[in-house]
Amino acid sequence: MNAGGKRYCVITPYFKEDKAMLTRCMDSVARQTVPVEHILVADGFPQDWIATKPVRHIVLDRAHSDFGNLGRGIGAMMAVAEQYSGIAFLDADNWYDDDHIECCLAALQQNPRSIFAAAQRRFVRPNGTPMPTIKPAELPHHEHIDTNCYFFLPRSYYLLHHWCTMPRELSESGDHLFYLLMYHTVPQPAVVGKPTVNYLCMIDEIYRQLGEEPPPGAKSTLDWRDRQRWLNSLPQEDLNLVKLLTGLDFQRLPAA
């Protein structure tokens, strides 16, 4: 969609999320105070009802077991080719505040050297209630940006292909690896001053920290050691290839 001559889009890869969850995600994009187009990418399990909605729908013929990275990257590459003025990501289980895109653009306007924005999250329970005492470990407090919090300007587009080329064995850490790539490659992001991303919290430890029973399906926080063991197992030639595919210079390090 056009906003003052600019066109923005949101990319959402999806897998087997139910209709209610996808609808919540899609409705939040449709409500943005700055008009945006929404591109959904089915990772092997397309839902036909989406074709009746005012969104774009890309279908991958099989699932890729990479936490949505390929779908995210393919959607982004299409948006780059179609010359959108800004690209954001939103996973199917999360949703935006109505002013999310507006706040990202405002942060970038205030920080003209930045070529991408970092939004902030609020953690929410499966019933939609917020977890206000939890401060996600991300900018401006910690060195991390969640996938749902990226907003890219065209000068950063040349890095987006790494979502497609990142090895599947590293995909669970994709958002942090991409953050490290951006950190070492481009100026620091414009940080949005308030949370505008509603993040469905399925992290076991956070519920226990609050004295609550974790919901069904909750998982422990990510442990890098499994990925480091995989890196350590690679011959140097393959480790060099991983560097090309990720843009990061991994080393063999103790996994323990």
Q: What is each PLM-predicted segment?
A:
Residues 117-129:
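Short beta-strand-to-loop element that shapes/binds the nucleotide-sugar donor at the catalytic cleft/hinge
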Residues 94-107:
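Acidic donor-binding/catalytic loop of UDP-sugar-dependent glycosyltransferases
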Residues 24-36:
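Short, acidic, metal-binding catalytic loop of nucleotide-sugar glycosyltransferases
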Residues 120, 189-196:
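Catalytic beta-strand/loop signature of glycosyltransferases that borders the donor
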Residues 1-27:
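N-proximal low-complexity "stem/linker" segments adjacent to membrane-targeting elements
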Residues 169-178:
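Acidic donor-binding loop at a coil-to-helix junction in glycosyltransferase catalytic cores
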Residues 63-79:
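Glycine-rich, basic loop-to-helix element that forms the pyrophosphate-binding segment
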